[in-house]
C-alpha cells in the first residue's frame, strides 16, 4: 500500500470513528491518535523521504487536505457534544418556575437614624435648617470659639482624641454654632439651625458610655431672643418626642458657651413622676443641656451682643432612643446584632 492509499485509508477510518464519538474526552483522544506528533499520520508521512520530487507535493497536499477536513468535522462534533451535554443538564435540572422563591428579609433604618429623622422633622416644621459639620475639627473651633481658651479649666471636663496639637476629633457638635454664625448673613434675618453628627470622647465603653456617640446641636440667634423662647421650643420638642403629658424641669448648670446655662429634666414617662427604677425614684430624668448663647461666643462671630442674643441646646440621640424604647445598654446601638436592631425596624 503506497502513501496515498495509506492516507486515504486513515482518512476513512478517522471520519468513521468521528461519527461514533459521544464525549469530549474520546474526541480529543481521537485527534491525538490520528494527527498528534506520534499519531498515525505522522508515521505515514515519515515515508516521504523515499518519494521522488514529483510525488512529494502530491502527498503533502493530500495530507493537508485531510487535516483541514478533520479539523472542520472535529469542531462541528465538539459543538454537537457540548449541546448534547447542555440539553441533558437542562432535562435533569428542570426548574419549576411555579415554586415559591426564597423570601428576601426586609431591612429597616437603624434606630438612631429613625430618632434623628424624627427630631429633624420636628425642627424643619419650626423653620430650622439642617447643617453638617466636620468630625475632624480644629482646636480653635472646638474649644476657643466655644469660650474655652487653652488655659480654661473647663477643658478638663472633656477627654479629647487629639490628632495633632491643633487638630482633633470633635468632642461636641457645638463648633457648628461658630461656623454657621460666621457664614450667616444676619442682615437678611436671624439664624435657626440644628447640626446632627457624631462626636468623640475618650470614654471607656460601658452600658452608658461610648467613645463615639451622636449629638444634635441646636442654635437660634436673632434680635430679642430670650430664655422664654428656649423654654417654649424645648417644651414643644420634648412633648412631640415623649408625649403631650410630659413636663420639663429646669435646673441651673454650667457650660462655658452659654450663660445662663441649664440642665433640662423630663417627667418620668414610666411612673408619671411618682418615682420608679427608671427615674431612680426622683420622678425626673435628665434629658439635655441648654442655655443662652454666651456673649463672648456672639462677639467672636462678629455680632454685637448688645443687639443680638440667642439660645443653644444639645440633644443626645442615643439617650433619647434609650429612654423612649427602654434600652439599658448603649453598646447595643453599635454591635450590629440584627436580633436587637430588628425590634425597632420601620
Swiss-Prot record:
Residue numbers binding Mg(2+)? 259
The UniProt catalytic activity note for this protein reads: tRNA(Phe) + L-phenylalanine + ATP = L-phenylalanyl-tRNA(Phe) + AMP + diphosphate + H(+)
Know the name of this protein? Phenylalanine--tRNA ligase alpha subunit
Its keywords, alphabetically, are: Aminoacyl-tRNA synthetase, ATP-binding, Cytoplasm, Ligase, Magnesium, Metal-binding, Nucleotide-binding, Protein biosynthesis
Its GO biological process terms?
Answer: phenylalanyl-tRNA aminoacylation
Gene assigned in the entry: pheS
- SUBUNIT field: Tetramer of two alpha and two beta subunits.
What species is this protein from? Lactococcus lactis subsp. lactis (strain IL1403)
GO molecular function annotations of the record: ATP binding; catalytic activity, acting on a protein; magnesium ion binding; phenylalanine-tRNA ligase activity; transferase activity; tRNA binding
Name the cofactor(s): Mg(2+)
Q: Does the keyword DNA repair apply?
A: no
Cellular component GO terms, alphabetical? cytoplasm
The protein's Enzyme Commission number: 6.1.1.20
Please give the chief subcellular localization of this protein. cytoplasm
> Which SUPFAM superfamilies does the record match to this protein?
Class II aaRS and biotin synthetases, tRNA-binding arm
Gene3D superfamilies cross-referenced by the UniProt entry = Bira Bifunctional Protein, Domain 2
Source taxon at top rank = Bacteria
Per the record, the similarity remark reads: Belongs to the class-II aminoacyl-tRNA synthetase family. Phe-tRNA synthetase alpha subunit type 1 subfamily.
Annotated localization:
Cytoplasm
Amino acid at each position: 500500500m503506497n502513501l496515498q492509499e495509506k492516507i486515504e485509508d486513515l482518512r476513512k477510518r478517522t471520519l468513521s470513528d468521528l461519527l461514533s464519538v459521544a464525549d469530549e474526552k474520546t474526541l480529543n483522544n481521537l485527534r491525538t491518535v490520528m494527527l498528534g506528533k506520534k499519531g498515525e499520520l505522522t508515521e505515514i508521512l515519515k515515508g516521504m523521504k523515499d518519494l521522488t520530487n514529483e510525488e512529494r507535493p502530491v502527498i503533502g497536499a493530500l495530507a493537508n487536505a485531510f487535516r483541514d477536513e478533520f479539523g472542520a468535522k472535529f469542531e462541528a462534533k465538539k459543538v454537537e457534544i457540548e449541546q448534547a451535554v447542555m440539553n441533558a443538564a437542562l432535562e435533569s435540572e428542570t426548574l419549576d418556575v411555579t415554586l415559591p422563591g426564597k423570601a428576601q428579609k426586609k431591612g429597616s433604618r437603624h434606630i438612631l437614624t429613625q430618632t434623628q429623622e424624627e427630631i429633624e422633622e420636628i425642627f424643619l416644621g419650626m423653620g430650622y435648617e439642617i447643617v453638617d459639620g466636620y468630625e475632624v475639627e480644629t482646636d480653635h473651633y472646638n474649644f476657643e470659639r466655644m469660650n474655652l481658651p487653652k488655659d480654661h479649666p473647663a477643658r478638663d471636663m472633656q477627654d479629647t482624641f487629639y490628632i495633632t496639637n491643633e487638630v482633633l476629633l470633635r468632642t461636641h457638635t457645638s463648633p457648628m454654632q461658630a461656623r454657621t454664625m460666621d457664614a450667616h448673613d444676619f442682615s437678611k434675618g436671624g439664624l435657626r439651625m440644628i447640626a446632627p453628627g457624631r462626636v468623640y470622647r475618650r470614654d471607656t465603653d460601658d452600658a452608658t458610655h461610648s467613645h463615639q456617640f451622636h449629638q444634635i446641636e441646636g442654635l437660634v440667634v436673632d434680635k430679642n431672643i430670650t430664655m422664654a423662647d428656649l423654654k417654649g421650643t424645648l417644651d414643644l420638642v420634648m412633648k412631640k418626642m415623649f408625649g403631650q403629658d410630659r413636663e420639663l424641669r429646669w435646673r441651673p448648670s454650667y457650660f462655658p458657651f452659654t450663660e445662663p446655662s441649664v440642665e433640662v429634666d423630663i417627667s418620668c414617662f414610666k411612673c408619671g413622676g411618682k418615682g420608679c427604677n427608671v427615674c431612680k425614684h426622683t420622678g425626673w430624668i435628665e434629658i439635655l443641656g441648654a442655655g443662652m448663647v454666651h456673649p463672648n461666643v456672639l462677639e467672636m462671630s462678629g455680632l454685637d451682643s448688645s443687639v443680638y442674643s440667642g439660645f443653644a441646646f444639645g440633644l443626645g440621640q442615643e439617650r433619647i432612643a434609650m429612654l423612649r424604647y427602654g434600652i439599658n445598654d448603649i453598646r447595643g446601638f453599635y454591635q450590629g446584632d440584627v436580633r436587637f436592631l430588628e425590634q425597632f425596624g420601620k
